[in-house]
Every structure is written in structure tokens, then in C-alpha cells.
């Protein structure tokens, strides 16, 4: 190895350079937007980090026309509690089709705290392994097809997207790495918005 470095100009691969990133930078950058969030069918995604130290809240909007939008709404240490998150979600029950919540620590408590408000069947979703793989595919496909955008000032979401790696899961893969929590929450929100049959924004017409 030392000889190769000195004589041949060869260096051992650096992990950061060879890591199997989940989202190519050029594809992510092509979906950046400076336009404000559109109106449309809305869902929220909540992801507790693997070590339980952080929680990310994201939203996704699918308008009648044009690309969907994903947004990082908040990212906080779980040491601050989750009362703020439960209150925030309960205040917006009438505006969203669903909230998708995933993680090991904090999920049960959050679901319990919003249960009295989020009563509609299917409004609170706890994704299975299959759902997590599907949510990842939903976001990556949307990025590849340029059918989703993200706001250019969302640096935390940007950093998460560009540093997340592919993590094997149940025969497929999902987002992984030390900073994947925001992009995971975004994928859950978009998947929820696309698959939920509930849409509070639509007024039923009779006759």
C-alpha cells in the first residue's frame, strides 16, 4: 500500500468518496425551488432517529397541478420532549390527510397524545418495513422524474439528502447514515400524501 502511494500515485479509497449515497447530488439539486409552498393535499411525516436523540417533522403537499413539495418543518432533540410536536399536529388535524410516524423511541407516546384528535381511520400511520421501502422509492422516483421540489433555504434538509446513504432493509433499502432523519421524514410525508384516501381540502359535492 505504501509503495503504491509513493511510486504509483495510488491512494486507498476514502469512505466519504465511495459511500453509496442514496440521492445523487445532481438529481437533488435539479429539484430545488425558490417558489413558495403550493396549496394542495397535505401530509406530515415524523421520524425519530435510530438512537432516539432527535425527531424530525416534515410536510408534503401535492397540488392539483405542478410538482409536489417536501419541507422540513422542525428538527429538535427529543430531550425537549414531544409535547410541542403533539400540540402542533393536533392543531392541524383538519388540514392534513394523515401523519406517518416511524422510529423506536417516542412513537408510542406521540401516537397516544394525538389519538383523541386524530380519530379518523387511516389518519395516523405507523409504517411497516414494506412501507418504509415504498416511501423511499416514492421520494427517489419523484426526484428522478422532477415531480417534487424542495425550498432552497432548507439547509438542514439539503444536508440530510446529500449525506444519506442506502441502508439495506427487508430485501430493499431505505435512507441511512448519521443524518438521515430529516430526509426519512420527508419521504414518509410524501408517501402518505400520495397514498392516503383522506383529503380534508376537498369539499364533497352532492347532486
Which functions belong to the PLM regions below?
Residues 1-5, 51, 76-86, 104-108, ...:
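Conserved structured core elements
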Residues 1-46:
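ATPase catalytic-site recognition across NTP-hydrolyzing enzymes
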Residues 6-10, 14, 58-59, 109, ...:
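C-terminal nuclease/phosphodiesterase catalytic domains that cleave nucleic-acid phosphodiester bonds
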Residues 14-18, 50-55, 65-68, 80, ...:
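Flexible loop/turn segments at secondary-structure boundaries
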Residues 28-38, 51-105:
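Nucleic-acid-processing active sites and adjacent nucleic-acid-binding tracks
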Residues 34-35, 114-117:
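Short, conserved catalytic or adaptor-binding loops enriched in Gly and charged residues
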Residues 40-43, 52-55, 96, 170, ...:
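Active-site lining segments that contact anionic ligands and/or coordinate catalytic metals
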Residues 45, 100-102, 151:
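A structural signal for short, well-ordered beta-strand segments and their strand-loop junctions
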Amino acid at each position: 500500500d505504501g509503495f503504491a502511494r509513493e511510486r504509483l500515485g495510488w491512494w486507498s479509497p476514502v469512505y466519504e468518496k465511495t459511500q453509496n449515497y442514496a440521492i445523487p447530488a445532481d438529481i437533488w439539486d435539479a429539484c430545488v425551488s425558490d417558489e413558495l409552498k403550493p396549496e394542495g393535499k397535505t401530509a406530515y411525516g415524523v421520524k425519530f432517529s435510530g438512537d432516539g436523540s432527535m425527531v424530525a417533522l416534515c410536510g408534503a403537499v401535492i397540488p392539483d397541478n405542478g410538482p409536489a413539495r417536501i419541507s422540513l418543518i422542525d428538527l429538535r432533540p427529543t430531550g425537549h420532549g414531544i409535547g410541542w410536536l403533539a400540540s402542533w399536529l393536533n392543531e392541524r388535524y383538519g388540514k392534513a390527510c394523515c401523519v406517518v410516524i416511524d422510529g423506536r423511541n417516542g412513537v408510542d407516546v406521540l401516537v397516544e397524545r394525538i389519538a383523541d384528535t386524530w380519530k379518523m381511520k387511516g389518519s395516523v400511520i405507523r409504517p411497516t418495513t414494506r412501507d418504509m421501502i415504498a416511501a423511499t422509492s416514492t421520494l427517489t422516483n419523484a426526484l428522478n422524474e422532477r415531480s417534487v421540489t424542495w425550498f432552497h433555504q432548507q439547509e438542514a434538509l439539503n444536508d440530510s439528502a446529500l449525506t444519506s446513504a442506502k441502508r439495506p432493509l427487508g430485501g430493499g433499502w431505505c435512507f441511512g447514515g448519521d443524518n438521515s432523519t430529516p430526509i426519512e421524514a420527508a419521504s414518509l410525508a410524501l408517501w402518505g400524501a400520495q397514498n392516503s384516501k383522506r383529503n380534508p381540502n376537498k369539499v364533497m359535492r352532492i347532486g
